[in-house]
Amino acid sequence: MLNGLTRVSTSSELESILDIVQSSGEIAVVFTSPSIGDLETIASETQRRQLRIAGIPRGGYTILPAIPLYDDELLQMCERYTAANEYEKAEMRNSLYMREYPLFAYSMRHQRALFHPADYVSRILQFCSYYVQAPDADVLSLQDRSPFLHISPIKEICTQLRLIARGTPVAASDSESPVPEQLRLHAESDVEKLAAERATAMSIAASSGGASETEQLSLFSGVAPSALFQKDAVEEVNKDAEDTMEDLTGEETVDAVHSFQAEYLTLDGFELVTKASIFYDREGEGQCIVAVYIPGGVPEDTCRAAAAVLEPAATKKNLRAPTNGGLPPDTGIVGYYDYLTNPTQHKCRETEFSRRNWGLLAQSEPLLKHLDKLYSQLAPMHHHLQRVAIPSQYQLCGTVFSTITVNRNFRTAVHTDRGDFRSGLGVLSVINGEFEGCHLAIKRLKKAFQLKVGDVLLFDTSLEHGNTEVVNPEIHWQRTSVVCYLRTGLMSSVCEMERRKHLNRLILEQLLNTEVRNTTVNINGADSSLPPLFVPTRLASHLAPVQLAALGFIVERTEKQSGCVVAMTMGLGKTLVALTLCFSQLYLAPQADILILTPKPIISHWVDEKNKWGMHGLHFPHFVASDGLNSLEFEQQLLEYERQKNNEKPKSGHIFVINGEYLAGFLRRFKRFTPLVMIVDEGHRVAAKGNKLTESLDRLRCNLRIVLSGTPLQNDASELYRLVGWVNKGVSRVLPPKRFQELANDINQFVEGDDGAFYNAVVAQEYIQDWMRGFVFREMENDLPPLHDYLLICGSSDVQREYEEKLGLTETAMTALKATEHRPHHLSTHPACYLAFISDSYQSMVSGWTVRALSNTSRQRVSQLEEIDTMRLEQYVQLVENEQLDAFIDLSGKMRVLVDIVLRVQARKEKLIVFSLYVGSQDLIHRTLTALRVCTFTVRGRDSQDRRRRAMQEFSENKDLIVLVLSTKIAAYGLDFTAANHVVLFDSWWNPQVDAQAIARAYRRNQRKPVTVYRLISATENKFVLRSQTRKIALFKCILHERTSRQALPDELEDCAANEKDEERRNFWAKLKMTSLAGDTRALLNVYRYQESVRESE
């Protein structure tokens, strides 16, 4: 007995009947009897086999096969089928045989199917089509004759589509005999009983560690609101949240002061501007507005009405003393602010003054509207970009302003405004007072602007500015001014996620005590100011908070006809974000086309993700991918699209996933191709100068350009500038390339070790971050398990040192050599690898560990070797053939360290990936580990997508497969190897993002264990790679992580082997340091934490 339920024994006769239904696809009618069993027995066994049961005919039950489609799939098919003509219906029926049915395969895993699931689906579609168009009299009689009308979801789908088609629900006619009451109750009670039993079974399974909550949910029984989103994707609110929210008045930081002592300006040296004027930055390329002066721009009565409600916001509780000679001035913040550095629950919200005075603030709306109109007329490009960037939730009175700084009797010292949107302008106006002087002076322009009540100044708040002296200050003077602007912190990923959680809570409150039965849900539906964002209901709970936030960020930009960059750390699920966006766009515009451009190796990853999430409702009628696995099917899909473009068939939306090499040919074939959205995966490729790919994409008329990249900045800051400029062409018109390069140079100077450039680097860093925030969604952090990342400096054997000296691998020589022909890399792998590479006999050596007869060309290369070298090469082969593996391994520090790491991982029954850039190194590693009887698999750049897919599956499922050896630059993209929690970078590339991509194969979503990364660095060539990497990482942190960083100096790196907190790992480092190579050199010289190679400055 379990919760009042008992296991009912099943008769052999009932089992035979159910076997026939399950294997043949035919229906069967049964009646309760001693040989069959009672209703409970029939219902229990039918449910166990996932078959369906209907309460007809009278006194009996009809058993039907399991429906081989998800509810939303079936609904979509029925919708299309009932609306199609006879020719289109025939095509749809034929297409049913070309698709896969994962639900059917699962339900038949213990049975041999004697029918095709397409036959059953075709019957359902035909019935639904007839039902939708049938006369009422026929519909009523169908209740007695069709079991389809007694099982979900077919009965709900038929009823819904008939209601849509005819506009009236099905009702009993007086002229027709009603459905017998006893039969109606009989059928309904069966459905209710089965539903209740199913829910009870789910509860039991859950309590006993059965299927997960999301697996148990189905639209058959509806989705409970509590299960619609992940728990951490919904805002937590205390009952007394309104009263307990922290008062952070005065905690706002809006100034950047440039000196320790306040600098006050006088009118001396400045030209006083009293007439309407526009000023441009002529130092840049083209004309970029930096200031617009409008005397009398706002009526005085409008100003004074606003002053009456805004002036009380200005108090002495603030952090602006440095711009007021050391004493707090009267100032305050109205509207919204981003309290990102405060330890508060709500980071992005209205200020305390605003929260308590929203009703009164309506009196300032005419002022804000007036300033907004002037802004749009006189600086239209800045205004447009600010309109695109501002989240609708933070718009004050529908303007492009999120925040107002109110100053009362405040003569500011020289400063710049911190946190303002740099693609926009600040709008300053004096709204009350009686005074003389106190002009606003901008040092760079050498202009001072006379500001009286009603005067307006639009200006670049990143320029140093301050007020001149007050005339006759001994006489009582009053002056109230406001600066209206957009706070960029409100567009941060923190604020986006916070806002998303708030919206999710509102949605759940609206759905309280109901079930979500629709196949899709508009997750923006709780806020009418937001564009719709439709997500499959079953998918919503699989979207992490950061993914939901990214989606919200994207659709707000696309609604305003702007693109954006989605910069998320590798492994956070950018592909799912993009596919969900495609679903929403096609839901709203079913005939639109979408282009996804991605590197060829990643196309199969997109297909796999589409198939994976299709099981959760993410379906696309036409998903055309050129993955090379089925070129015939790809061509057929293109021909189908061609017929639609030529109006030979009705148009339906397509998603094209193609690689850059095929793009030109695709566009030649479809000259009128105009996608609604263009998504570029690994989008940093469009940032390269003179890129032909970018030229091809620019020929497409598409404003909605979405760039996906975990590494939007690869080598220098100018890449990011070109990237943002590509998704929104207007950006370069407000920040000329020359000005951006000046900022980037300031950062580079500090990154490369000039501590004297720190201040300029901070200023440049903040400017670039504020400039890009409206167009770049950044989430560089994650909630994954811990990552332990180490630099292991490996020693060299005596043979390696000998060849290093022969090659002249000193530091100065290495700089000139630049790894010519990769010889230093082969030498650091193993002397055998180096000698074989030189002699061109390597392929034979690694294949059979024997030396073959050399060709004439090879003999010429062998002439580079001395006789001792040839003897050594043969000796190394003999070591392996004689199974003297330790002697062979001890000839290389990196190989010795790698082997010991592998054996440690194997002993822990864990898995490891080894990444290497070079084929020779990959092969030698594979052969060495195989000789040690470590089960190893290798995936090279030349391997097919199918082999890579099989490797992923084998690595995940085969417990004996311990090590994967992968090509860094090819296999590092589009693969998920979270079965491994150890990663070895056997060699490193000049671009650190290549290594980061490799690590992300294991350190990504779905990883449940801490991940350890071992970066093997030789004492020769890899030092220079490391220096290049750390410079670029420091730059990356400055720009995207908002951390002012620089390369660590050699004497700043501290060996962490002795103070390693993990005892087992500490002992392992000690063992490696005691291990000797050939020639009595230590295998491991130093251990450093990789993150310490870049130093962050406070």
Curated annotation (Swiss-Prot):
Residues 1-540 are annotated as: Thymine dioxygenase. Its cofactor is Fe(2+). Residues 555-730 form the Helicase ATP-binding domain. Fe cation binds at H415, D417, H465. PROSITE patterns: HELICASE_ATP_BIND_1, HELICASE_CTER. Binds 1 Fe(2+) ion per subunit. GO terms for molecular function: ATP binding; ATP hydrolysis activity; DNA binding; DNA translocase activity; ferrous iron binding; helicase activity; thymine dioxygenase activity. Its EC number is 3.6.4.12, 1.14.11.6. ATP binds at M568, T569, M570, G571, L572, G573, K574, T575. Residues 541-1098 are annotated as: DNA Helicase. Coiled coil: none annotated. Keywords: ATP-binding, Dioxygenase, DNA-binding, Helicase, Hydrolase, Iron, Metal-binding, Nucleotide-binding, Nucleus, Oxidoreductase. One of its GO terms (biological process) is reciprocal meiotic recombination. Residues 897-1057 form the Helicase C-terminal domain. A motif (DEAH box) lies at residues 681-684. 2-oxoglutarate binds at R479. It is found in: Nucleus. It comes from the Eukaryota. One of its GO terms (cellular component) is nucleus. It catalyses: ATP + H2O = ADP + phosphate + H(+); thymine + 2-oxoglutarate + O2 = 5-hydroxymethyluracil + succinate + CO2. Dioxygenase that catalyzes the first step of DNA base J (beta-d-glucosyl-HOMedU) biosynthesis by converting thymine to 5-hydroxymethyluracil (HOMedU). DNA base J is a hypermodified thymidine residue found in the genome of kinetoplastid parasites, which is localized primarily to repetitive DNA, namely the telomeres, and is implicated in the regulation of antigenic variation. Probably also acts as a DNA helicase. Recognizes and binds specific regions of the genome, hydrolyzes ATP and allows the DNA base J de novo synthesis. In the C-terminal section; belongs to the SNF2/RAD54 helicase family. In the N-terminal section; belongs to the TET family. JBP2 subfamily. This is Bifunctional helicase and thymine dioxygenase JBP2. It comes from Leishmania major.
